[in-house]
Amino acid sequence: MGQESSGRDALTRRDYLTYGGAVVAGEFLAGCASQAESGATPESTATDTATATATTESATSRTATADSYSVTMAPVGEVTFDSPPETWVANNGSWADMGMALGLEPPKAVWLTNRYHTRYYDGIDGVSVDTSEMVSLYQDGVSRELFYELDGDVHVIDPNFLVNRFQGWERSDVDEIAENVAPFFGNCIYAQHYPWHDDYRYYTLYEGFEKLAQVFQRTERYEAFEDLHDEFLSKLAPVVPGQGERPSVAVLWGVGDTPEKFYPYIVGGGTGFKHLRDLGVRDALAATEIEDFHGSRAAIDLETLLEVDPEVLMLRGYESKAREEFEDTVVDFLRNHGTASALTAVENDDVYRAGGLYQGPITNLVLTERAAGQLYDFDGELFDRERVAEIVDGAF
């Protein structure tokens, strides 16, 4: 981490708030006083490389003052807000996309901006986001100073992610930022394979989405998306063939545009696999001795992949490329490689982009529909794009 700046002693706008004890029994009061205002590995870290709408939801309890409210989410617990946050920082594109769905301004920062794939919005008229001022939290390390500079009203990040995934952070660093800047409120919902996830309480995409909607007091948008999602799943069901008719699929993170090494993924829980679970994907790696990358941090080579020989390759790490560019670079390399060209998926032109690690309610709709076409030759629309734009805009 960088050295502490001399400006650390200067008052932030939260110093003007009445905390009523600041931090009591793990509960943080989040004040919002201001009225203005493809890497080498899947995860590049130093260790592993509107208007608020009042609600009466049972999960949201009114405490502290007449206008304050509390929202509870594991592992952080209960967090009290005296008003809806106006600015925020998100861990990843899952949360950023949820914010988009709620009609929020984009987060000031995400872990890596190049992993928030806004290209998915291009096919939905009326839905777009300006990320020109968004910054990456990870910049050859994660500096506490950056959290002070960003000065968000809430950090939608599981603090355990910072402590366990980046060597430079301790619990005391998290406590400092929570007390002096803003609370943490988040869950590592995108994957469920980390060794530090023993006894971890996971949330589904829509459970996490509901919690975020409660934080920002925009539950009507959440409910509208939930209805849209139910309709989407009902349309998707007849698209998915019977188990015996589904091709075997291997999900891998390819290293570079000429991949001879791959990081394997077992299709499991987490938002990063929701589209594949909903499509009932038959996982070619699940029955092998190949371990999931999240737990092993190990790669496999083309020879090992050829032994498995899946019918379809779904490759991660290429979402910044359009389909044509992906095919002209990565797929073309595999077609002309001595070993890769023998893969059934390569021979049959069944090599596709797998979708990003981080999915929210909008991006999940887009990626699931795309994968339905890739895997099951579906040609059509599974969700109402105009309705998505209406919900984002607050038109119910």
List the model feature ranges, each with a label.
Residues 199-203, 315-396:
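Structured C-terminal subdomain patch of bacterial secreted/periplasmic proteins
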Residues 96-100, 145-149, 172-175, 179, ...:
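Solvent-exposed, polar/charged alpha-helical surfaces in well-ordered, non-transmembrane soluble domains
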